[in-house]
Every structure is written in C-alpha cells, then in structure tokens.
C-alpha cells in the first residue's frame, strides 16, 4: 500500500527534474457536475505526460542501488518516460514497443537514447520479451504498473 509518505519521498527524489504544471478549473465542468473540478496540464511535462513522474521515481531509486540499466515495455508514454529518466540518470534503457505504436513515440523513445525492440502485437507477448531481455542483460524490468516507485511517482502530481 502506497502512503502519502511514499509519495512525498518520491517527490523529493524527482522535484528537480519535473515541471510544476498548472492547475485549472472549468466553470462549465463545475456547473455540469455541481462540483469543483480541477484539471492539471501534465502535457507540459518533459515527455508530454505524467508518466515521467513515475519513471523518474523508479529509476532514481534504482540508480541509488547501483543499477546501470533497465528494461520496460510500453506503447508510448511509459516508454518515453523510462527512456528520458534513463537518459537523465545516465542509465541504459531497453524498451519493448509494438511495431504499430505511433511512429513519433518510437522515434522519441529512440532519441532519448533507448534501444527499442519492436514486436508484433497480438502474436508476441511484450511482457515475455521484456522478461527475457531483463534476464539476459541483468537489468530490472520496470513495469508501468505493479511497481511501488512508479505508483508513488505518479502520485506526486497531486502534491
């Protein structure tokens, strides 16, 4: 279970790398739902998504442990987050992406220094491919879920 202390700890590890994004309120949404609704514009982040928060949190913790590289799988936003975080922390990143992922996401992931491994969706398992690479190279697999440092990092958008 992730606690507020975990989220604050993640924030302390990543705050010098993230963009402080603005919070907006929409009168139309507030009126439609009879509530105060707030929107946070995470498209302003380094990679255009909140996923960089979790990636920075996870990779900063791994870097502290002496890990030199990571493996991840994603169709786009997690791939860009992990590859950018790896670039920031001078780590190797290997990202498994589907061949039909948006070409701009593949290109951006590569431009962050990642080694991109393409697979055929619905025929191959991205998780099995990533697990095999992780085992062969000795790098941990950083999943976009089931990772407490990823979750705590994503939670920093609320601080």
Question: What do these predicted ranges mean?
Answer:
Residues 1-159:
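PLP-dependent amino-acid enzyme catalytic core
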């Amino acid at each position: 279970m992730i606690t507020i202390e975990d989220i604050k700890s993640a924030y302390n590890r990543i705050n010098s790398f993230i963009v402080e994004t603005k919070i907006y309120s929409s009168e139309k949404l507030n009126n439609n739902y009879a509530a105060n609704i707030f929107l946070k514009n995470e498209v302003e982040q380094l990679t255009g998504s909140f996923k960089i928060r979790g990636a920075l949190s996870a990779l900063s913790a791994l870097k502290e442990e002496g890990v030199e590289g990571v493996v991840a799988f994603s169709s786009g936003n997690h791939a860009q987050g992990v590859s950018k975080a790896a670039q920031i922390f001078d780590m190797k990143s290997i990202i498994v992406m589907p061949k039909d992922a948006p070409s701009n996401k593949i290109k951006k992931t590569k431009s962050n220094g990642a080694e991109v491994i393409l697979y055929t969706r619905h025929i191959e398992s991205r998780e099995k491919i990533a697990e095999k690479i992780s085992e062969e190279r000795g790098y941990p697999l950083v999943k976009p879920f089931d990772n407490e440092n990823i979750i705590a990092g994503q939670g920093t958008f609320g601080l």
